[in-house]
Amino acid sequence: MTTVRTRIAPSPTGDPHVGTAYIALFNLCFARQHGGQFILRIEDTDQLRSTRESEQQIFDALRWLGIEWDEGPDVGGPHGPYRQSERGHIYKKYSDELVEQGHAFTCFCTPERLDAVRAEQMARKETPRYDGHCMHLPKDEVQRRVAAGESHVTRMKVPTEGVCVVPDMLRGNVEIPWDRMDMQVLMKADGLPTYFLANVVDDHLMGITHVLRGEEWLPSAPKLIKLYEYFGWEQPQLCYMPLLRNPDKSKLSKRKNPTSITFYERMGYLPQALLNYLGRMGWSMPDEREKFTLAEMIEHFDLSRVSLGGPIFDLEKLSWLNGQWIREQSVEEFAREVQKWALNPEYLMKIAPHVQGRVENFSQIAPLAGFFFSGGVPLDASLFEHKKLDPTQVRQVLQLVLWKLESLRQWEKERITGCIQAVAEHLQLKLRDVMPLMFPAITGHASSVSVLDAMEILGADLSRYRLRQALELLGGASKKETKEWEKIRDAIPG
Protein backbone atom coordinates (compact mmCIF):
# COMPACT_ATOMS: atom_id res chain seq x y z
CA MET A 1 0.00 0.00 0.00
CA THR A 2 1.25 3.51 -0.83
CA THR A 3 2.60 5.46 2.14
CA VAL A 4 0.56 8.58 2.85
CA ARG A 5 2.70 11.71 2.46
CA THR A 6 1.43 15.22 3.18
CA ARG A 7 3.22 18.54 3.28
CA ILE A 8 3.13 22.19 4.28
CA ALA A 9 4.84 24.75 2.04
CA PRO A 10 5.00 28.18 3.72
CA SER A 11 6.62 31.27 2.25
CA PRO A 12 9.28 32.90 4.47
CA THR A 13 8.10 36.45 3.86
CA GLY A 14 7.07 37.65 7.33
CA ASP A 15 5.99 36.53 10.77
CA PRO A 16 4.80 32.88 10.94
CA HIS A 17 1.01 32.92 10.53
CA VAL A 18 -1.53 30.99 12.61
CA GLY A 19 -3.09 29.96 9.29
CA THR A 20 0.15 28.18 8.41
CA ALA A 21 0.05 26.34 11.74
CA TYR A 22 -3.62 25.44 11.18
CA ILE A 23 -2.97 23.86 7.78
CA ALA A 24 0.24 22.23 9.05
CA LEU A 25 -1.66 20.69 11.97
CA PHE A 26 -4.30 19.07 9.76
CA ASN A 27 -1.68 17.77 7.31
CA LEU A 28 0.32 16.35 10.22
CA CYS A 29 -2.72 14.68 11.79
CA PHE A 30 -3.86 13.16 8.49
CA ALA A 31 -0.40 11.74 7.80
CA ARG A 32 0.14 10.37 11.31
CA GLN A 33 -3.38 8.90 11.50
CA HIS A 34 -2.57 6.89 8.38
CA GLY A 35 0.93 5.94 9.50
CA GLY A 36 2.42 8.30 6.94
CA GLN A 37 4.97 11.09 6.67
CA PHE A 38 4.74 14.88 6.93
CA ILE A 39 7.10 17.10 4.91
CA LEU A 40 7.98 20.78 5.29
CA ARG A 41 8.96 22.61 2.11
CA ILE A 42 9.92 26.27 1.79
CA GLU A 43 8.38 28.36 -1.01
CA ASP A 44 11.02 31.07 -1.30
CA THR A 45 10.78 31.94 -4.99
CA ASP A 46 9.78 35.52 -4.09
CA GLN A 47 13.38 36.62 -3.76
CA LEU A 48 12.50 40.22 -2.86
CA ARG A 49 10.48 39.26 0.22
CA SER A 50 11.88 35.89 1.31
CA THR A 51 14.47 35.83 4.09
CA ARG A 52 16.31 33.10 5.98
CA GLU A 53 15.35 34.89 9.21
CA SER A 54 11.65 34.40 8.41
CA GLU A 55 12.36 30.79 7.46
CA GLN A 56 13.94 30.16 10.87
CA GLN A 57 10.99 31.83 12.57
CA ILE A 58 8.68 29.36 10.79
CA PHE A 59 10.75 26.42 12.05
CA ASP A 60 10.85 27.82 15.60
CA ALA A 61 7.15 28.71 15.73
CA LEU A 62 5.93 25.33 14.46
CA ARG A 63 8.26 23.48 16.82
CA TRP A 64 7.13 25.67 19.73
CA LEU A 65 3.60 24.44 18.97
CA GLY A 66 4.77 20.83 18.92
CA ILE A 67 4.57 20.31 15.15
CA GLU A 68 7.47 18.20 13.85
CA TRP A 69 8.22 17.09 10.29
CA ASP A 70 9.95 14.05 8.80
CA GLU A 71 11.70 15.85 5.94
CA GLY A 72 12.61 19.47 5.36
CA PRO A 73 15.39 22.02 4.78
CA ASP A 74 16.67 21.74 8.34
CA VAL A 75 16.35 17.98 8.81
CA GLY A 76 17.15 16.77 5.30
CA GLY A 77 15.60 13.80 3.56
CA PRO A 78 15.78 11.79 0.32
CA HIS A 79 13.74 14.24 -1.78
CA GLY A 80 15.72 17.47 -1.30
CA PRO A 81 16.52 20.20 -1.79
CA TYR A 82 13.48 21.39 0.19
CA ARG A 83 13.85 25.07 -0.67
CA GLN A 84 12.31 26.01 -4.01
CA SER A 85 15.04 28.59 -4.63
CA GLU A 86 17.51 25.66 -4.77
CA ARG A 87 15.44 23.70 -7.31
CA GLY A 88 15.53 26.14 -10.24
CA HIS A 89 17.21 23.68 -12.61
CA ILE A 90 14.46 21.14 -11.92
CA TYR A 91 11.65 23.57 -12.77
CA LYS A 92 13.47 24.73 -15.92
CA LYS A 93 13.63 21.16 -17.17
CA TYR A 94 9.90 20.59 -16.73
CA SER A 95 8.96 24.02 -18.07
CA ASP A 96 10.96 23.34 -21.23
CA GLU A 97 9.26 19.97 -21.53
CA LEU A 98 5.82 21.61 -21.52
CA VAL A 99 6.89 24.06 -24.23
CA GLU A 100 8.31 21.26 -26.40
CA GLN A 101 5.07 19.29 -26.09
CA GLY A 102 2.96 22.32 -27.02
CA HIS A 103 1.33 22.71 -23.59
CA ALA A 104 3.07 26.01 -22.84
CA PHE A 105 4.66 28.86 -24.77
CA THR A 106 7.17 31.69 -24.42
CA CYS A 107 5.60 35.11 -23.88
CA PHE A 108 7.44 38.40 -24.51
CA CYS A 109 4.58 40.76 -23.61
CA THR A 110 5.68 43.72 -21.53
CA PRO A 111 3.90 44.72 -18.30
CA GLU A 112 2.73 47.85 -20.11
CA ARG A 113 1.06 45.84 -22.89
CA LEU A 114 -0.56 43.48 -20.40
CA ASP A 115 -1.92 46.42 -18.39
CA ALA A 116 -3.35 47.98 -21.55
CA VAL A 117 -5.02 44.72 -22.63
CA ARG A 118 -6.58 44.21 -19.20
CA ALA A 119 -7.81 47.81 -19.08
CA GLU A 120 -9.53 47.34 -22.45
CA GLN A 121 -11.10 44.06 -21.32
CA MET A 122 -12.40 45.62 -18.12
CA ALA A 123 -13.81 48.57 -20.10
CA ARG A 124 -15.76 46.00 -22.14
CA LYS A 125 -16.80 44.34 -18.86
CA GLU A 126 -14.92 41.16 -19.77
CA THR A 127 -12.96 38.97 -17.37
CA PRO A 128 -9.33 40.19 -17.52
CA ARG A 129 -7.11 37.46 -18.95
CA TYR A 130 -4.14 37.02 -21.26
CA ASP A 131 -5.17 37.41 -24.91
CA GLY A 132 -2.82 34.80 -26.43
CA HIS A 133 -0.72 37.41 -28.25
CA CYS A 134 2.49 35.32 -28.16
CA MET A 135 0.93 31.87 -28.26
CA HIS A 136 1.58 31.20 -31.95
CA LEU A 137 4.95 32.88 -32.52
CA PRO A 138 7.23 30.93 -34.92
CA LYS A 139 9.78 28.78 -33.14
CA ASP A 140 12.75 30.46 -34.85
CA GLU A 141 11.52 33.91 -33.80
CA VAL A 142 11.19 32.75 -30.20
CA GLN A 143 14.71 31.30 -30.24
CA ARG A 144 16.13 34.48 -31.76
CA ARG A 145 14.47 36.78 -29.23
CA VAL A 146 15.45 34.61 -26.28
CA ALA A 147 19.06 34.44 -27.54
CA ALA A 148 19.06 38.25 -27.83
CA GLY A 149 18.26 38.46 -24.12
CA GLU A 150 14.71 39.77 -24.48
CA SER A 151 12.73 39.51 -21.25
CA HIS A 152 10.21 36.66 -21.34
CA VAL A 153 8.08 34.31 -19.28
CA THR A 154 6.61 30.86 -19.89
CA ARG A 155 2.81 30.55 -19.89
CA MET A 156 0.65 27.43 -19.85
CA LYS A 157 -2.16 26.88 -22.32
CA VAL A 158 -5.63 26.31 -20.89
CA PRO A 159 -8.96 25.37 -22.47
CA THR A 160 -11.39 28.22 -23.12
CA GLU A 161 -14.59 26.17 -23.03
CA GLY A 162 -16.20 23.56 -20.82
CA VAL A 163 -15.65 22.88 -17.14
CA CYS A 164 -12.95 21.28 -15.03
CA VAL A 165 -14.11 18.82 -12.39
CA VAL A 166 -12.10 19.28 -9.18
CA PRO A 167 -12.36 16.23 -6.88
CA ASP A 168 -12.34 17.66 -3.35
CA MET A 169 -12.20 15.30 -0.37
CA LEU A 170 -14.57 17.59 1.58
CA ARG A 171 -17.00 18.86 -1.07
CA GLY A 172 -17.03 16.06 -3.62
CA ASN A 173 -16.72 17.05 -7.29
CA VAL A 174 -16.62 20.82 -7.83
CA GLU A 175 -17.17 22.12 -11.38
CA ILE A 176 -15.22 25.24 -12.37
CA PRO A 177 -15.62 26.77 -15.87
CA TRP A 178 -12.43 26.97 -17.90
CA ASP A 179 -13.28 30.46 -19.13
CA ARG A 180 -12.43 31.71 -15.63
CA MET A 181 -8.83 30.54 -16.03
CA ASP A 182 -6.02 32.72 -17.33
CA MET A 183 -2.98 31.43 -19.23
CA GLN A 184 -0.94 31.14 -16.06
CA VAL A 185 2.71 32.20 -15.97
CA LEU A 186 4.78 29.13 -15.03
CA MET A 187 8.31 30.54 -15.21
CA LYS A 188 8.93 34.21 -14.41
CA ALA A 189 11.33 36.53 -16.20
CA ASP A 190 13.87 36.04 -13.38
CA GLY A 191 14.02 32.31 -14.17
CA LEU A 192 12.14 31.25 -11.04
CA PRO A 193 8.85 29.33 -11.11
CA THR A 194 5.46 30.53 -9.97
CA TYR A 195 3.47 28.72 -7.29
CA PHE A 196 1.62 26.58 -9.82
CA LEU A 197 4.53 24.93 -11.60
CA ALA A 198 6.67 24.57 -8.48
CA ASN A 199 3.90 22.96 -6.44
CA VAL A 200 2.97 20.41 -9.07
CA VAL A 201 6.58 19.45 -9.80
CA ASP A 202 7.57 19.30 -6.13
CA ASP A 203 4.50 17.38 -5.00
CA HIS A 204 5.11 14.79 -7.73
CA LEU A 205 8.85 14.38 -7.16
CA MET A 206 8.42 14.29 -3.38
CA GLY A 207 5.73 11.62 -3.60
CA ILE A 208 2.98 13.70 -1.98
CA THR A 209 -0.22 11.64 -1.93
CA HIS A 210 -2.65 14.07 -0.28
CA VAL A 211 -2.70 17.88 -0.41
CA LEU A 212 -4.62 19.68 2.32
CA ARG A 213 -4.57 23.41 1.59
CA GLY A 214 -6.74 26.47 2.23
CA GLU A 215 -9.98 26.84 0.27
CA GLU A 216 -8.75 30.14 -1.21
CA TRP A 217 -6.83 27.93 -3.68
CA LEU A 218 -9.94 26.05 -4.88
CA PRO A 219 -10.84 28.52 -7.70
CA SER A 220 -7.39 28.03 -9.29
CA ALA A 221 -7.36 24.23 -8.90
CA PRO A 222 -8.06 23.60 -12.63
CA LYS A 223 -4.60 24.95 -13.51
CA LEU A 224 -2.95 22.42 -11.20
CA ILE A 225 -5.12 19.59 -12.49
CA LYS A 226 -4.31 20.51 -16.10
CA LEU A 227 -0.57 20.51 -15.33
CA TYR A 228 -0.80 16.98 -13.90
CA GLU A 229 -2.60 15.97 -17.08
CA TYR A 230 0.04 17.61 -19.30
CA PHE A 231 2.85 15.82 -17.46
CA GLY A 232 0.99 12.50 -17.40
CA TRP A 233 1.37 12.23 -13.62
CA GLU A 234 -1.02 10.81 -11.05
CA GLN A 235 -2.68 13.64 -9.19
CA PRO A 236 -2.61 13.65 -5.36
CA GLN A 237 -5.94 13.65 -3.57
CA LEU A 238 -7.05 17.23 -2.92
CA CYS A 239 -8.65 18.67 0.20
CA TYR A 240 -9.54 22.36 0.47
CA MET A 241 -9.78 23.34 4.14
CA PRO A 242 -12.15 26.09 5.30
CA LEU A 243 -10.46 29.43 5.96
CA LEU A 244 -9.97 30.84 9.45
CA ARG A 245 -12.19 33.89 9.88
CA ASN A 246 -12.52 36.95 12.09
CA PRO A 247 -15.61 37.24 14.33
CA ASP A 248 -17.25 39.36 11.57
CA LYS A 249 -16.81 36.37 9.18
CA SER A 250 -14.15 38.14 7.08
CA LYS A 251 -10.94 36.26 6.25
CA LEU A 252 -8.54 36.24 9.20
CA SER A 253 -6.18 39.17 8.73
CA LYS A 254 -3.71 41.15 10.80
CA ARG A 255 -5.91 44.24 10.46
CA LYS A 256 -8.57 42.69 12.70
CA ASN A 257 -6.83 39.95 14.66
CA PRO A 258 -3.22 39.22 15.64
CA THR A 259 -2.14 36.53 13.16
CA SER A 260 1.47 35.85 14.15
CA ILE A 261 2.25 32.71 16.14
CA THR A 262 4.98 34.67 17.94
CA PHE A 263 2.32 37.13 19.18
CA TYR A 264 0.57 34.34 21.08
CA GLU A 265 3.87 33.05 22.43
CA ARG A 266 4.75 36.58 23.63
CA MET A 267 1.28 36.97 25.17
CA GLY A 268 1.89 33.93 27.35
CA TYR A 269 -0.40 31.39 25.72
CA LEU A 270 0.56 27.76 26.16
CA PRO A 271 1.59 26.10 22.88
CA GLN A 272 -0.54 23.04 23.56
CA ALA A 273 -3.57 25.28 24.17
CA LEU A 274 -3.09 27.21 20.92
CA LEU A 275 -2.61 23.95 19.01
CA ASN A 276 -5.73 22.56 20.71
CA TYR A 277 -7.68 25.67 19.65
CA LEU A 278 -6.48 25.41 16.04
CA GLY A 279 -7.56 21.77 16.08
CA ARG A 280 -11.09 22.91 16.95
CA MET A 281 -11.19 25.21 13.93
CA GLY A 282 -13.78 23.44 11.80
CA TRP A 283 -13.14 20.01 13.35
CA SER A 284 -14.40 18.22 16.44
CA MET A 285 -13.60 15.15 18.49
CA PRO A 286 -16.11 12.26 18.28
CA ASP A 287 -17.18 12.94 21.89
CA GLU A 288 -17.29 16.73 21.25
CA ARG A 289 -14.80 17.47 24.07
CA GLU A 290 -13.17 20.89 23.75
CA LYS A 291 -9.83 20.20 25.41
CA PHE A 292 -7.55 17.59 23.83
CA THR A 293 -3.88 16.93 23.12
CA LEU A 294 -2.16 16.56 19.77
CA ALA A 295 -1.82 12.81 20.37
CA GLU A 296 -5.57 12.55 21.03
CA MET A 297 -6.37 14.54 17.89
CA ILE A 298 -4.18 12.25 15.80
CA GLU A 299 -5.77 9.15 17.31
CA HIS A 300 -9.31 10.28 16.48
CA PHE A 301 -8.62 12.29 13.33
CA ASP A 302 -11.13 11.88 10.51
CA LEU A 303 -11.63 14.37 7.67
CA SER A 304 -15.34 13.60 7.63
CA ARG A 305 -15.59 15.60 10.87
CA VAL A 306 -14.36 18.80 9.17
CA SER A 307 -17.12 21.41 8.91
CA LEU A 308 -17.19 23.61 5.81
CA GLY A 309 -18.57 26.60 7.71
CA GLY A 310 -15.77 29.15 8.11
CA PRO A 311 -14.27 28.59 11.60
CA ILE A 312 -14.16 31.77 13.71
CA PHE A 313 -10.82 32.57 15.34
CA ASP A 314 -11.99 34.23 18.56
CA LEU A 315 -9.39 35.57 20.98
CA GLU A 316 -11.76 35.34 23.94
CA LYS A 317 -12.47 31.65 23.32
CA LEU A 318 -8.76 30.95 22.88
CA SER A 319 -8.08 32.71 26.20
CA TRP A 320 -10.80 30.65 27.91
CA LEU A 321 -9.32 27.41 26.58
CA ASN A 322 -5.81 28.51 27.57
CA GLY A 323 -7.15 29.12 31.08
CA GLN A 324 -8.44 25.53 31.19
CA TRP A 325 -4.97 24.25 30.34
CA ILE A 326 -3.35 26.50 32.96
CA ARG A 327 -5.71 25.41 35.74
CA GLU A 328 -5.06 21.73 35.06
CA GLN A 329 -1.31 22.15 35.47
CA SER A 330 0.41 21.24 38.70
CA VAL A 331 1.84 24.19 40.66
CA GLU A 332 5.33 23.02 39.66
CA GLU A 333 4.40 22.90 35.96
CA PHE A 334 2.77 26.31 36.17
CA ALA A 335 5.84 27.83 37.83
CA ARG A 336 8.14 26.32 35.19
CA GLU A 337 6.03 27.68 32.33
CA VAL A 338 5.89 31.15 33.89
CA GLN A 339 9.65 31.14 34.39
CA LYS A 340 10.21 30.02 30.80
CA TRP A 341 7.94 32.80 29.53
CA ALA A 342 8.92 35.70 31.81
CA LEU A 343 12.61 34.94 32.21
CA ASN A 344 13.42 33.98 28.65
CA PRO A 345 17.17 34.78 28.43
CA GLU A 346 17.06 35.86 24.78
CA TYR A 347 14.16 38.24 25.42
CA LEU A 348 15.76 39.64 28.58
CA MET A 349 18.96 40.38 26.67
CA LYS A 350 16.96 42.51 24.22
CA ILE A 351 15.38 44.49 27.06
CA ALA A 352 18.37 44.84 29.42
CA PRO A 353 20.33 47.51 27.48
CA HIS A 354 17.30 49.82 27.52
CA VAL A 355 16.64 49.40 31.25
CA GLN A 356 20.09 49.13 32.83
CA GLY A 357 20.96 52.81 32.51
CA ARG A 358 17.63 53.98 33.95
CA VAL A 359 17.44 52.11 37.27
CA GLU A 360 19.28 52.35 40.58
CA ASN A 361 18.01 49.07 41.99
CA PHE A 362 16.22 46.02 40.62
CA SER A 363 12.91 46.90 42.28
CA GLN A 364 12.61 49.78 39.80
CA ILE A 365 12.60 47.43 36.81
CA ALA A 366 8.97 46.29 37.05
CA PRO A 367 7.41 49.80 37.06
CA LEU A 368 9.70 50.89 34.20
CA ALA A 369 9.64 47.81 31.98
CA GLY A 370 6.56 45.86 33.02
CA PHE A 371 4.90 46.62 29.68
CA PHE A 372 7.43 44.29 28.01
CA PHE A 373 5.81 41.38 29.88
CA SER A 374 2.12 42.06 29.28
CA GLY A 375 -0.27 41.70 26.38
CA GLY A 376 -2.31 44.86 26.50
CA VAL A 377 -1.37 47.76 28.76
CA PRO A 378 -3.56 49.77 31.17
CA LEU A 379 -4.64 52.86 29.24
CA ASP A 380 -5.68 56.28 30.49
CA ALA A 381 -7.41 58.55 27.97
CA SER A 382 -5.92 61.62 29.67
CA LEU A 383 -2.46 60.53 28.48
CA PHE A 384 -3.59 61.16 24.90
CA GLU A 385 -4.52 64.79 25.51
CA HIS A 386 -2.32 66.81 23.16
CA LYS A 387 -1.23 70.45 23.24
CA LYS A 388 -1.30 70.77 19.45
CA LEU A 389 -3.88 68.22 18.24
CA ASP A 390 -7.59 67.98 18.99
CA PRO A 391 -9.14 64.58 19.89
CA THR A 392 -10.17 63.85 16.29
CA GLN A 393 -6.65 64.58 15.03
CA VAL A 394 -5.22 62.33 17.75
CA ARG A 395 -7.38 59.43 16.55
CA GLN A 396 -6.49 60.21 12.94
CA VAL A 397 -2.75 60.13 13.65
CA LEU A 398 -2.98 56.84 15.56
CA GLN A 399 -5.11 55.25 12.80
CA LEU A 400 -2.78 56.37 10.02
CA VAL A 401 0.28 55.13 11.91
CA LEU A 402 -1.44 51.79 12.51
CA TRP A 403 -2.32 51.42 8.83
CA LYS A 404 1.23 52.24 7.75
CA LEU A 405 2.66 49.75 10.24
CA GLU A 406 0.26 47.06 8.98
CA SER A 407 1.88 47.30 5.55
CA LEU A 408 5.42 47.06 6.95
CA ARG A 409 7.13 43.86 5.80
CA GLN A 410 10.33 44.05 7.86
CA TRP A 411 9.83 45.03 11.50
CA GLU A 412 12.95 47.05 12.26
CA LYS A 413 13.40 50.25 14.26
CA GLU A 414 14.48 52.30 11.23
CA ARG A 415 11.46 51.18 9.19
CA ILE A 416 9.06 51.73 12.11
CA THR A 417 10.47 55.24 12.50
CA GLY A 418 10.11 55.78 8.75
CA CYS A 419 6.40 54.90 8.87
CA ILE A 420 5.69 57.29 11.74
CA GLN A 421 7.81 60.00 10.12
CA ALA A 422 5.93 59.61 6.82
CA VAL A 423 2.58 60.09 8.56
CA ALA A 424 3.85 63.12 10.48
CA GLU A 425 5.29 64.82 7.41
CA HIS A 426 2.17 64.20 5.32
CA LEU A 427 0.05 65.82 8.05
CA GLN A 428 2.57 68.68 8.24
CA LEU A 429 3.60 67.66 11.74
CA LYS A 430 6.97 66.96 13.27
CA LEU A 431 8.00 63.59 14.67
CA ARG A 432 8.02 65.13 18.15
CA ASP A 433 4.31 65.94 17.70
CA VAL A 434 3.45 62.28 17.11
CA MET A 435 5.73 60.49 19.59
CA PRO A 436 3.80 61.66 22.71
CA LEU A 437 0.89 59.57 21.38
CA MET A 438 3.03 56.49 20.79
CA PHE A 439 4.35 56.29 24.37
CA PRO A 440 1.01 55.74 26.13
CA ALA A 441 -0.33 53.53 23.33
CA ILE A 442 2.65 51.16 23.46
CA THR A 443 3.90 51.43 27.08
CA GLY A 444 0.88 52.72 29.01
CA HIS A 445 2.99 55.64 30.27
CA ALA A 446 3.67 59.19 29.12
CA SER A 447 7.39 58.41 29.12
CA SER A 448 9.50 55.29 29.33
CA VAL A 449 12.41 53.67 27.54
CA SER A 450 12.66 54.52 23.83
CA VAL A 451 9.24 53.66 22.44
CA LEU A 452 10.75 52.89 19.02
CA ASP A 453 13.15 50.38 20.57
CA ALA A 454 10.25 48.99 22.58
CA MET A 455 8.14 48.47 19.44
CA GLU A 456 10.98 46.63 17.71
CA ILE A 457 11.38 44.34 20.74
CA LEU A 458 7.65 43.76 21.27
CA GLY A 459 7.20 42.81 17.62
CA ALA A 460 4.72 43.76 14.91
CA ASP A 461 1.55 42.04 16.09
CA LEU A 462 1.81 43.10 19.74
CA SER A 463 2.64 46.71 18.83
CA ARG A 464 -0.27 46.89 16.39
CA TYR A 465 -2.54 45.20 18.94
CA ARG A 466 -1.79 47.94 21.47
CA LEU A 467 -2.37 50.69 18.92
CA ARG A 468 -5.79 49.15 18.18
CA GLN A 469 -6.53 49.13 21.92
CA ALA A 470 -5.65 52.81 22.17
CA LEU A 471 -7.89 53.65 19.22
CA GLU A 472 -10.79 51.71 20.74
CA LEU A 473 -10.34 53.56 24.04
CA LEU A 474 -10.53 56.90 22.22
CA GLY A 475 -13.62 55.94 20.23
CA GLY A 476 -12.15 54.45 17.04
CA ALA A 477 -13.10 55.83 13.64
CA SER A 478 -16.57 56.31 12.18
CA LYS A 479 -17.35 54.96 8.70
CA LYS A 480 -17.16 58.47 7.30
CA GLU A 481 -13.80 59.11 8.99
CA THR A 482 -12.46 55.77 7.82
CA LYS A 483 -13.22 56.61 4.18
CA GLU A 484 -11.65 60.06 4.49
CA TRP A 485 -8.58 58.79 6.32
CA GLU A 486 -8.06 55.93 3.87
CA LYS A 487 -7.67 58.51 1.10
CA ILE A 488 -5.04 60.29 3.21
CA ARG A 489 -3.30 56.96 3.91
CA ASP A 490 -3.13 56.13 0.21
CA ALA A 491 -1.49 59.48 -0.51
CA ILE A 492 1.28 58.99 2.06
CA PRO A 493 4.56 58.05 0.31
CA GLY A 494 6.31 54.79 1.10
Curated annotation (Swiss-Prot):
It catalyses: tRNA(Glu) + L-glutamate + ATP = L-glutamyl-tRNA(Glu) + AMP + diphosphate. Keywords: Aminoacyl-tRNA synthetase, ATP-binding, Cytoplasm, Ligase, Metal-binding, Nucleotide-binding, Protein biosynthesis, Zinc. Binds 1 zinc ion per subunit. The keyword Zinc-finger does not apply. Its main location: cytoplasm. GO terms for cellular component: cytosol. Its cofactor is Zn(2+). Its EC number is 6.1.1.17. SUPFAM superfamilies: An anticodon-binding domain of class I aminoacyl-tRNA synthetases (SSF48163), Nucleotidylyl transferase (SSF52374). A motif ('KMSKS' region) lies at residues 251-255. It is found in: Cytoplasm. Belongs to the class-I aminoacyl-tRNA synthetase family. Glutamate--tRNA ligase type 1 subfamily. This is Glutamate--tRNA ligase. It comes from Pseudomonas paraeruginosa (strain DSM 24068 / PA7) (Pseudomonas aeruginosa (strain PA7)). The gene is gltX.
